[in-house]
């Protein structure tokens, strides 16, 4: 057991060491700069890569529902690329404009493609994956559902986190008559896993999470969609405990933001309140003092890892910190205009609250 604990500590130190590295060329650090060896995803779609004429890198793929997506990256030397339409096309299916800089960056134990705007602010991430369906299921499990929730009557439902490598550990407690934890799978719409959990007995439940809380209702498939008006099992249950598969590596409610670059597909799984707290938790890790007697300050004062030290921690933020803050802000802004679509998809709630 001591050996396992020692290895865990070493791994954590290694991860933070990698995240603290400055912008040296990726090839010099790892030698793994061949984009064609990986499949890349924003959490909604995935792309394989092949080499075109003149060294152009062609990204081709799509969602689980439809294909035919394509764009290209033009190598600019080192870990720099330029975003452009694929040959014969005028559109780009990812967030970005022709000419945007794209860089291959190391964060934690992985490498990511990051798109930057004209002011060099990052706003889009492509992560390396192996299987899009499994990635979407893992994102739903760990970012949309994971946690313990209780309503005013005291009923509690717990969704347990599960690594992508062990989907058999994906369990929920509180939906069966005996109250035991049981495995679940996801229902699908348009060939894509969605926020419907299916238990071993075949019963299905639609799970909707907003800033008002978690609501679970029975559901059945009607034509091509899951019924959204079934019997309510629990309504507006409040999260009483955060659960994460990364809890053992980093303290906090959102350790994912300290260990990896987050994609839009992952960030859209969180409620607006979660996004706000996640963003502020990044600052809190670096010792930021928040508004005295404010909600944010009181929240972090309850955490034993929080040590407020400065009113400005901008010089303490790592490249990964800055990236995830920028990505969270981008999704918060997008939520202001995408609310009707996101409500239809059952993914999000209200617009972000003002700054702390």
Kindly label every feature range from the protein language model.
Residues 1-11:
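Bacterial N-terminal signal peptides that target proteins for export
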Residues 10-20:
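Bacterial N-terminal signal peptides
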Residues 22-37, 135-143, 243-258, 340, ...:
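Sec-dependent signal peptide cleavage junction
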Residues 26-54, 60, 126-156:
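Tryptophan-anchored aromatic micro-motifs
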Residues 44, 149, 153, 163, ...:
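Sec/Tat-exported extracytoplasmic proteins
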Residues 46-51, 60-109, 155-160, 164-228:
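Contiguous, well-ordered beta-strand patches that form the walls/edges
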Residues 116-146, 219-222, 226-253, 343:
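Pro/Ala/Gly-rich low-complexity, hydrophilic intrinsically disordered segments
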Residues 267-307:
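Amphipathic alpha-helical packing elements
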């Amino acid at each position: 057991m001591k050996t396992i604990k020692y290895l865990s500590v070493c791994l954590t130190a290694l991860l933070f060491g990698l995240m603290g590295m400055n912008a040296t060329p990726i090839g010099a650090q790892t030698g793994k700069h061949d984009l064609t060896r990986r499949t890349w995803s924003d959490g909604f779609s995935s792309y394989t890569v092949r080499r075109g004429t003149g060294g152009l890198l062609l990204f081709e793929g799509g969602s689980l529902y439809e294909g035919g997506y394509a764009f290209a990256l033009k190598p600019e030397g080192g870990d720099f690329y330029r975003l452009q339409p694929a040959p014969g096309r005028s559109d780009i299916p990812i967030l970005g404009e022709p000419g945007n800089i794209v860089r291959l960056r190391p964060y934690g134990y992985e490498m990511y493609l990051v798109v930057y705007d004209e002011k060099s602010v990052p706003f889009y991430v492509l992560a390396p994956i192996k299987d899009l369906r499994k990635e979407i299921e893992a994102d739903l499990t760990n970012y949309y559902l994971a946690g313990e929730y209780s309503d005013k009557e005291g009923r509690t439902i717990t969704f347990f986190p599960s690594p992508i490598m062990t989907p058999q550990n994906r369990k929920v407690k509180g939906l069966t008559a005996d109250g035991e934890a049981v495995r679940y799978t996801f229902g699908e719409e348009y060939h894509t896993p969605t926020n419907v959990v299916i238990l071993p007995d075949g019963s299905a439940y639609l799970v909707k999470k907003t800033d008002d809380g978690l609501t679970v209702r029975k559901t059945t498939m009607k034509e091509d969609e899951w019924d959204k008006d079934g019997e309510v099992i629990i309504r507006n249950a409040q999260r009483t405990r955060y659960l994460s598969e990364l809890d053992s590596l980093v303290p906090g409610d959102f350790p994912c933001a300290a260990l990896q670059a987050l994609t839009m597909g992952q960030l859209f799984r969180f409620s607006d309140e979660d996004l706000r707290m996640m963003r502020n938790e990044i600052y809190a890790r670096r010792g930021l003092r928040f508004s005295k007697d404010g909600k944010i300050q009181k929240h972090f004062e309850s955490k034993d890892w929080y040590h407020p030290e400065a009113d400005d921690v901008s010089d303490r933020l790592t490249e990964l910190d800055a990236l995830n803050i920028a990505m969270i802000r981008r999704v918060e802004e997008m939520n202001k205009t995408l609310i009707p679509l996101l409500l239809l998809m059952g993914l999000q709630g209200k617009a972000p609250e003002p700054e702390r």
